[in-house]
Amino acid sequence: MTLLQRLIKQAKKPNGFVGSVMLRIMNVAHSGMNTWLIKHCDICDGDIVLDIGCGGGKTLQTLSKMNPGGKIYGIDFSEQAIKDSIKTNKMDVANGKVIVKQASVSNIPYTDQFFDTITAFQTHYFWPDLANDVKEVFRVLKHGGKFIIMSELYKIHYHMKVYKTTSEIEQLFESVGFQKIQIIQNARKGYLCIIGMK
């Protein structure tokens, strides 16, 4: 396995000391996207929010600050990511505002129509089966809720065999049942934001 392959494996499912270092690097590297996320999230105070693939927990922290009266949930299938997310959000976890669980996007451990907003920040290109996983997201999203995918374009093109184009993603969202789909790009930074309303 090459060094690049090892780093990609750690980015997908961080593990151990190297995984923890990778998560800290991602927390810093993604701060610009977190700022951009704030502009497009439009979260109402009191919302129940899920971040899928919460990684090192920086996005959970951002979402918590945006939503002082709400609850923020995070899932990741990496045990190391869960540990690091809890550490990053220690006070909010202790007071019950942030709840973090080890889980897969393919089987989200919450009831139907539970969340007002669901985010997937730099993760959807790692999901096991994007079409079925988007259906699972739709299941736990409330009517009127929104699903936000945010990613760097080059990562989509590198990691994904299908759903590489905005039209393919838009068709997927429509086929699942999302009513209003908005695609926002920051060409200068190479960011893509897809918002689907249920």
Predicted regions mapped to residue ranges:
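Conserved alpha-helix/loop element of class I SAM-dependent methyltransferases that forms part
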Residues: 28-47, 62
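Conserved SAM-binding loop of SAM-dependent methyltransferases across substrates and taxa
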Residues: 56-67
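Conserved SAM/SAH-binding beta-strand->alpha-helix loop
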Residues: 78-80
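Conserved SAM-binding loop
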Residues: 85-86
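A short acidic, Gly/Pro-enriched loop at the edge of an enzyme's catalytic core
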Residues: 106-118
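A short SAM/SAH-binding and catalytic strip from SAM-dependent methyltransferases
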Residues: 117-129
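A short glycine-rich, Lys/Arg-flanked "PGG" loop and its adjoining helix->strand segment in the class I
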Residues: 131-143
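Conserved beta-strand signature within the Rossmann-like core of class I S-adenosyl-L-methionine
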Residues: 145-151
